[in-house]
């Protein structure tokens, strides 16, 4: 028994041994507590009251309800309900499993609850949360023990707080004692395993799994406690084993607001288990902040960029999707996307879509809400077909009502479309003007009435369906309007020829026949007459004429009578308005009532008495009678009675005697004095109305004439008749009888002859009338002959000195108000005048800024090149200042302006059309793309990479395209044929920088491309461009087209031309050579962009400057880029356009036709008395002002130290860009020589201008001759010219041969005259004898004195030019070396004159300014002085006068 008791005691000791271990920390509240166990606690500062530490021992006065011992106590009766007090245990941070044990005392004598004792566990100083354990009620007058199994470990720390909460009963005591930290597991509370974080997407269910070890009491509750204090009960507890169980806590559809820290808590009366805090991580599914971006829209596709860089929500993003739907549609589709851009296919044209982006992160429910939608509309697609079923509904004379099939969306493929009714008809006038109009009908309407038409016209109508992406034209249908009454015959078309009793009347068809003219009706009647015998108004007579008879001869009319004529035309609808005119017949000569010559009533030696009978007036009364006496002489032809040779000039006897005439007026009688026949004695020595009737001389024979005159309205008609003959008295009787018989026979013959003459005259008059009628029928209008002196119309404009003009423009422009500047045309604003304009007394400002051909009318129809507000047009007068500001501006200059073209720029490419594009093609915008006529079997045959470009006030004036590749040559010629193009502009070489830029699309002679045959007709080669003329024929067509290709070859392989002179001349040549009625001008370079755009901008701006006085380069380029992508490719090109326009405005058009040169030149050299200057001088000053000096950087090679000795003067150096580098190597000598390559008119680099060789450079000079194949040397200075500082030594052998370095020069022959010494040399390279020799002719000009700016003789200089030209033609057109002392003024004068003569021979033009400017582009010292410039004009004049004299 004893052993059994001992064994029980031993087991009891072992079981209880852990409980007697020393705690790691704690508070027993005893005075003699173990110092090894520190007691650290505190009470909250802001509690409602404080716990009271009491020590009650036996014998201590204390309430009987309290147990003995030292502990913390709360007397609840002393505090108000709801008041709280806390005891805060020290912070704990344990590494291993431990247990917090405490004792508590809750007692109320009446059994009511004194309050609630709660225990809180605060982790890392966080919020207090909810109590993990609490106890209420009265539990007897004894201590109870509870445990806390806290699973929070280092590095985290936690605090245990004990809270006393006063109950409403307020009776009893609450005590707390022995708060101990034990280093072993709790026996009464389970320990939780580590609780892990839970991550879930918002809106999804979450679940915490709490695993606990220990024994769970039946009454034990498991809770999920949120750090903020909320509690979630366990959905279920599952026992894994007898000491392990699992509590599950589901959270349904969590949101971001529920993201917090959570821990598991088990609660039982004997203690609580508390896990670590785990985080519930709620991820918000991602949603884009911004809608997707539209990159490009097509008719059936949208290309978008997802734009997902900024999102709302959490990543990572594992999937991207596009959700799209019609804006008004019920359906939606979702497509997965793997790239940042996505193309939505198979969309409907012109339809609005909502497009959103869906983003998905990992986990269920990871797909976020759709992002903000992009609402975008697809482009319209090209219409499926043109409208069909065009037919008339009603036809009237002046209007047509047409109808067609209604259109649906499946045809229009766009909600925004227009149906245009395009029609045209001819006016039918002599000009055959065609009226063309397109009328837009209202959308949805399929009926339209065309009004204000002309009757009986063929109206050609076609329907055009247009939407923003294209157009479809229907077949042309012809309708004819109904007839109407014709318009009135134009009164001015009535032409007539009045005679005495006839009128020839001619008229023209009405300007508006309004149908088929069936007849003409002419009515006439007399309305006034000066002949009293004529009854007025007379009866009205009417005649009708056939439709092809537009004239009539009215006969049997009364002389001197006015007739009213009315002419009107008739169609099937009736008569039109009549044209009225009054025509007066001519008065006729009076008529006499003499059947034959009467016998005299009496006769004496000095008198003869005749019978005067009154005459009858015809159309006018008789005004006066006159008796004329004529001495009969044998030599005089006899006057026949009734002849027209009357006596219109009254002549007295004295006047006739003084003038030696044989006739005189013997009497003048008033008409009223001869009412009836009466005798009159000739020679009665009386005076009748101022005319003396002297006695007749007996020994003379006389002829007596009686003349009647009628005067009316300034018109006089005479008739005279011989009424008697008086013979000389000296004749015997017999001869007298014979004479009298002869006289009688003569009288009879005279009467017959007179009658015959009258008959012939009448027949002649009729023939003349008929011929006039025919002529009038053939030609509708005869201008009256006017003596005109043709004024000299000059082709060029006056120019003043550029700098002074520009300076004036800067000061004058401020006085011109804005509305004035906009309202005035360029010519008005800038005082445009041409050379030879006599109305202009001086030169104007504008004349220095812009020259040109005589001002052409500038249309004001809508131009596509509109001036912008942010970039307004620049006045020509302000252009120089504007360019200088843009080049020197620091904030906003050409760079920024050029870059602004590409802001928001979106290049479009035509898909599936690779055939006509280059490797990196510039795409053609569909809206302005040239569409070829379709071909059978090839659906893509309508495509060519070409765009229509508007000109200045001329739509689709250009076609910009790329240089044809081999496979698109046929399409290129198809386009030229289809568009009726007459000009092709090519601005590229076939190969540049070793790359093929364009295929040779034209034949050497003749070739066929598809069904088009191209024949090269002519090639004209000039220095900077080539003009080729082709003839085009196409199978199935009878027409033959002529096309010119203008090939500009001077554009450098890199950058832009150094000067714009040649390009401007090229543009003018193209403009002048292109017929006004031709189709578009085709322009191409390689890609059809940069150079092509430069050309078009220059062409348009030159016209704008001429017509409006302003240039708007920025908006012009902007408009071009809207037609074709990237039309100006570089900033350098953009600046070049400005410089070129400035040069054009400053220099102007200076070409003079040969036919006008003499008069123009005379005007140019005339000194203006106001300015004391001439136009020629002003032109030379302009030349100086536009010749920039060379910069040091431009002459870097000439300035190298090793080359300084090769320059005669450091002031005259050649620029690097035109140096002829020597090819032949000669020891240590380098390849530099002071020389420059320059162009002639027809050949590039035709001249090499250099200085007279120095002694050290003579070998280099002959190397230059040989290396560049120079067959002519022109020497314009004299040997030993100037002083010893400028030696001009002989550099050739004469005679014999001499070696200069590698070159051997041999004198072959020579000729000389007073003007010129010509030598022939043979030059060869002794190091390369196999190359053969070069024959060179040396021309030494002798007629240019040392100190003169110009040659002594123009004729001698022309002789030099002719000899050089002749030799060049014979020797195969080698280069010409021209030298003078310094390679400047004299050499430039020679080259300029040679260039001008080439112009005359090639194109009958003279342009000295162009020749000099071109030369100065290479060397600024060419044509140095005003005298030399003047001399060039003199040489041209001398040459032309020589041509005229041949």
From Swiss-Prot:
Stretches in topological domain Extracellular: 19-749
MAM domain segment(s): 25-188
Residue stretches making up the Ig-like C2-type domain: 190-275
Pfam families hit by this protein: fn3, Fn3_PTPRU, MAM, Y_phosphatase
Keywords: Cell adhesion, Cell junction, Cell membrane, Differentiation, Disulfide bond, Glycoprotein, Hydrolase, Immunoglobulin domain, Membrane, Phosphoprotein, Protein phosphatase, Receptor, Repeat, Signal, Transmembrane, Transmembrane helix
Induction: Up-regulated upon cell contact (at protein level). Down-regulated by phorbol ester (at protein level) and calcium ionophore but up-regulated by phorbol ester in megakaryocytic cells.
Residue segments, region Mediates interaction with CTNNB1: 771-887
Reactions it catalyzes: O-phospho-L-tyrosyl-[protein] + H2O = L-tyrosyl-[protein] + phosphate
Phosphoserine modified-residue sites: 848, 853, 863
Residue spans crossing the bilayer: 750-770
Disulfide bonds: 210-264
Occurrences of domain Tyrosine-protein phosphatase (ranges): 888-1144, 1176-1439
Localization per record: Cell junction; Cell membrane
Signal peptide bounds: 1-18
Effect on the protein upon substituting residue 835 to W: In a colorectal cancer sample; somatic mutation
Residues covered by the Fibronectin type-III domain: 288-383, 386-484, 485-591, 592-674
GO process annotations (BP): animal organ regeneration; cell adhesion; cell surface receptor protein tyrosine phosphatase signaling pathway; homotypic cell-cell adhesion; negative regulation of canonical Wnt signaling pathway; negative regulation of cell migration; negative regulation of cell population proliferation; neuron projection development
Its EC number(s): 3.1.3.48
Region (Disordered): 833-861
Positions of modified residues (Phosphotyrosine): 865
Glycosylation-annotated residues: 75, 410, 685
Distribution of this protein across tissues and organs: High levels in brain, pancreas, and skeletal muscle; less in colon, kidney, liver, stomach, and uterus; not expressed in placenta and spleen. Also detected in heart, prostate, lung, thymus, testis and ovary. Ubiquitously expressed in brain. Expressed by hematopoietic stem cells.
Effect of residue 1085 to S: Loss of phosphatase activity toward CTNNB1. Loss of the inhibitory effect on CTNNB1 transcriptional activity without effect on interaction with CTNNB1
Binding site for substrate: 1053, 1085-1091, 1129
Assembly and binders: Forms homooligomeric complexes which mediate cell homotypic adhesion. Interacts (via the cytoplasmic juxtamembrane domain) with CTNNB1; may mediate interaction with the cadherin/catenin adhesion complex. Interacts with KIT. May interact with AP3B1.
Listed name of the protein: Receptor-type tyrosine-protein phosphatase U
Gene name as annotated: PTPRU
């Amino acid at each position: 028994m004893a052993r059994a008791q001992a064994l029980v005691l031993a087991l009891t000791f072992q079981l209880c041994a852990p409980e007697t271990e020393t705690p790691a920390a704690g508070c027993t509240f005893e005075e003699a507590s173990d110092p090894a166990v520190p007691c650290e606690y505190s009470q909250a500062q802001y509690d409602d009251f404080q716990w009271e530490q009491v020590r009650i021992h036996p014998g201590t006065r204390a309430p009987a309800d309290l147990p003995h011992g030292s502990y913390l106590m709360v007397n609840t009766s002393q505090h108000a309900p709801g008041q709280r007090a806390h005891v805060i245990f020290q912070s704990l941070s344990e590494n291993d499993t431990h247990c917090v044990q405490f004792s508590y005392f809750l007692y109320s004598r009446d059994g009511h609850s004194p309050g609630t004792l709660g225990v809180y566990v605060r982790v890392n100083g966080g919020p207090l949360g909810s109590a993990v354990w609490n106890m209420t009620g009265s539990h007897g007058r004894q201590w109870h023990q509870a445990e806390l199994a806290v699973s929070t470990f280092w590095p985290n720390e936690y605090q245990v707080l004990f809270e006393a909460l006063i109950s409403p009963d307020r009776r009893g005591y609450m005590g707390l004692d022995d708060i101990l930290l034990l280093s072993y597991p709790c026996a009464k509370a389970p320990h939780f395993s580590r609780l892990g974080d839970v991550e879930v997407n918002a809106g999804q269910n979450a679940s915490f799994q709490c695993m606990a070890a220990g024994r769970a009491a039946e009454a034990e509750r498991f809770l999920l406690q949120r750090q903020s204090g909320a509690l979630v009960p366990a959905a279920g507890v599952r026992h894994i084993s007898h000491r392990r169980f699992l509590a599950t806590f589901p959270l349904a559809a969590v949101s971001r607001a529920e993201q917090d820290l959570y821990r598991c808590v088990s609660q039982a009366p004997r203690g609580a288990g508390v896990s670590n805090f785990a985080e519930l991580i709620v991820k918000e599914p991602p949603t884009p902040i911004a809608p997707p971006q539209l990159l490009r829209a097509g008719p059936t596709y949208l290309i978008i960029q997802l734009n997902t860089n900024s999102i709302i929500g959490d990543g990572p993003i594992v999937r991207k999707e596009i959700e799209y739907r019609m804006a008004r549609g019920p359906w939606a589709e979702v497509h997965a996307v793997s790239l940042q851009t996505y193309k939505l296919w198979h969309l409907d044209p012109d339809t609005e879509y909502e497009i959103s982006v869906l983003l998905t992160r990992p986990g269920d429910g990871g797909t976020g809400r759709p992002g903000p939608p992009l609402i975008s509309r697809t482009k319209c697609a090209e219409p499926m077909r043109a409208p069909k079923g065009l037919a008339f509904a009603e036809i009237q004379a002046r209007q047509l009502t047409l109808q067609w099939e209604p259109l649906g969306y499946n045809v229009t493929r766009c909600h925004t479309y227009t149906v245009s009714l395009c029609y045209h008809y001819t006016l039918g006038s002599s000009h055959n003007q065609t009226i063309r109009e397109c009328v837009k009908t209202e959308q949805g309407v399929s009926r339209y009435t065309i009004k204000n038409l002309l009757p009986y016209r063929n109206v050609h109508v076609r329907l055009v369906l247009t939407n923003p992406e294209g157009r479809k034209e229907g077949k042309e249908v012809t309708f004819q309007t109904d007839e109407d009454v014709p318009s009135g015959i134009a009164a001015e078309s009535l032409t007539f020829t009045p005679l005495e009793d006839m009128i020839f009347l001619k008229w023209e068809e009405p300007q508006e026949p309004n149908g088929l003219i069936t007849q003409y009706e002419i009515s006439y009647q007399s309305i006034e007459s000066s002949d009293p015998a004529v009854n007025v108004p007379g009866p009205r007579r009417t005649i009708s004429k056939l439709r092809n008879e537009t004239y009539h001869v009215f006969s049997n009319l009364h002389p001197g009578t006015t007739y009213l004529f009315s002419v009107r035309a008739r169609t099937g609808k009736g008569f039109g308005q009549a044209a009225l005119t009054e025509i007066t017949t001519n008065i006729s000569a009076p008529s006499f009532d003499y059947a034959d010559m009467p016998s005299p009533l009496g006769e004496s030696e000095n008198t003869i008495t005749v019978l005067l009978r009154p005459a009858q007036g015809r159309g006018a009364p008789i005004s006066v009678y006159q008796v004329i006496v004529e001495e009969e002489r044998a030599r005089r032809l006899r006057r026949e009675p009734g002849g027209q040779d009357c006596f219109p000039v009254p002549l007295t006897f004295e006047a006739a005697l003084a003038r030696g005439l044989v006739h005189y007026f013997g009497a003048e009688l008033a008409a009223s004095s001869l009412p009836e026949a009466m005798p009159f004695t000739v020679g009665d020595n009386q005076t009748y109305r101022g005319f003396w009737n002297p006695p007749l001389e007996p020994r003379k024979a006389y002829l007596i004439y009686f003349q009647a005159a009628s005067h009316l309205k300034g018109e006089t008609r005479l008739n005279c008749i011989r009424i008697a003959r008086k013979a000389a008295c000296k004749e015997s009787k017999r001869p007298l009888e014979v004479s009298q018989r002869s006289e009688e026979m003569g009288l009879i013959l005279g009467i017959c002859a007179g009658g015959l003459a009258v008959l012939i005259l009448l027949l002649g008059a009729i023939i003349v009338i008929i011929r006039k009628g025919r002529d009038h029928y053939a030609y509708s209008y005869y201008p009256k002959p006017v003596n005109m002196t043709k004024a000299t119309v000059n082709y060029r404009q006056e120019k003043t000195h550029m700098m002074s003009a520009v300076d004036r423009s800067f000061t004058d422009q401020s006085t011109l108000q804005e509305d004035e500047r906009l309202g005035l045309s360029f010519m008005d604003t800038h005082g445009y005048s041409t050379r030879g304009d006599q109305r202009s007394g001086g030169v104007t400002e504008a004349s220095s800024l812009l020259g040109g051909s005589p001002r052409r009318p500038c249309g004001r129809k809508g131009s596509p090149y509109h001036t912008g507000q942010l970039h307004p047009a620049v006045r020509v007068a302000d252009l120089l200042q504007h360019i200088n500001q843009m080049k020197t501006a620091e904030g906003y200059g050409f760079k920024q302006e050029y870059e602004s073209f590409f802001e928001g720029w979106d290049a479009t490419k035509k898909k599936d059309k690779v055939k006509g594009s280059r490797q990196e093609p510039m795409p053609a915008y569909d809206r302005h793309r040239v569409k070829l006529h379709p071909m059978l079997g090839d659906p893509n045959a309508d495509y060519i990479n070409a765009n229509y470009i508007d000109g200045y006030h001329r739509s689709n004036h250009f076609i910009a395209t790329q240089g044809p590749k081999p496979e698109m040559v046929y399409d290129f010629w198809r386009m030229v044929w289809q568009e009726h193009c007459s000009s092709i502009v090519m601005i590229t070489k076939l190969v540049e920088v070793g790359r093929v830029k364009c295929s040779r699309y034209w034949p050497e002679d003749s070739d066929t491309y598809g069904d088009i045959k191209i024949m090269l007709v002519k090639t004209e080669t000039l220095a900077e461009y080539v003009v080729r003329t082709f003839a085009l024929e196409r199978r199935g067509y009878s027409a033959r087209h002529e096309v010119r290709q203008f090939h500009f070859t001077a554009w450098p392989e890199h950058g832009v031309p150094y000067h714009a002179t040649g390009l401007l001349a090229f543009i003018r040549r193209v403009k002048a050579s292109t017929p006004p009625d031709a189709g578009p001008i085709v322009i191409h370079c390689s890609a059809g962009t940069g150079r092509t755009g430069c050309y078009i901008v220059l062409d348009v701006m030159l016209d704008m400057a001429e017509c409006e006085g302003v240039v708007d380069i920025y908006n012009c380029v902007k408009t071009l880029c809207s037609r074709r992508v990237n039309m100006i490719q570089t900033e350098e090109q953009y600046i070049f356009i400005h410089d070129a326009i400035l040069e054009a405005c400053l220099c102007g058009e200076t070409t003079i036709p040969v036919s006008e040169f003499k008069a123009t030149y005379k005007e140019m050299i005339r000194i203006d008395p106001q300015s004391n200057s001439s136009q020629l001088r002003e032109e030379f000053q302009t030349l100086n002002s536009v010749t920039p000096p060379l910069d040091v950087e431009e002459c870097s090679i000439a300035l190298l130290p090793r080359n300084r000795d090769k320059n005669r003067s450091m002031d005259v150096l050649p620029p690097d860009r035109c140096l002829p580098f020597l090819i032949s190597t000669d020891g240590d000598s380098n390849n530099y020589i002071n020389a420059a390559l320059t162009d002639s008119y027809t050949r590039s680099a035709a001249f090499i201008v250099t200085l007279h060789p120095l002694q050290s450079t003579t070998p280099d000079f002959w190397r230059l001759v040989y290396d560049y194949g120079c067959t002519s040397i022109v020497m314009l200075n004299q040997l030993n010219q100037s002083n010893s500082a400028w030696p001009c030594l002989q550099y050739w052998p004469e005679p014999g041969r001499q070696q200069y370095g590698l070159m051997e020069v041999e004198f072959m022959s020579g000729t000389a005259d007073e003007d010129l010494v010509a030598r022939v040399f043979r030059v060869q390279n002794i190091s390369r004898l196999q190359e053969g020799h070069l024959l060179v002719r040396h021309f030494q000009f002798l007629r240019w004195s040392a100190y003169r700016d110009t040659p002594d003789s123009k004729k001698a200089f022309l002789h030099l030019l002719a000899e050089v030209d002749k030799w060049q033609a014979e020797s195969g057109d080698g280069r010409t070396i021209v030298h003078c002392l310094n390679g400047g003024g004299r050499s430039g004068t020679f080259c300029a004159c040679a260039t001008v003569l080439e112009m005359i021979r090639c194109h009958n033009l003279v342009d000295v300014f162009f020749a000099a400017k071109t030369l100065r582009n290479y060397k600024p010292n060419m044509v140095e002085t005003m005298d030399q410039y003047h001399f060039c004009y003199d040489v041209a004049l001398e040459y032309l006068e020589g041509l005229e004299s041949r």
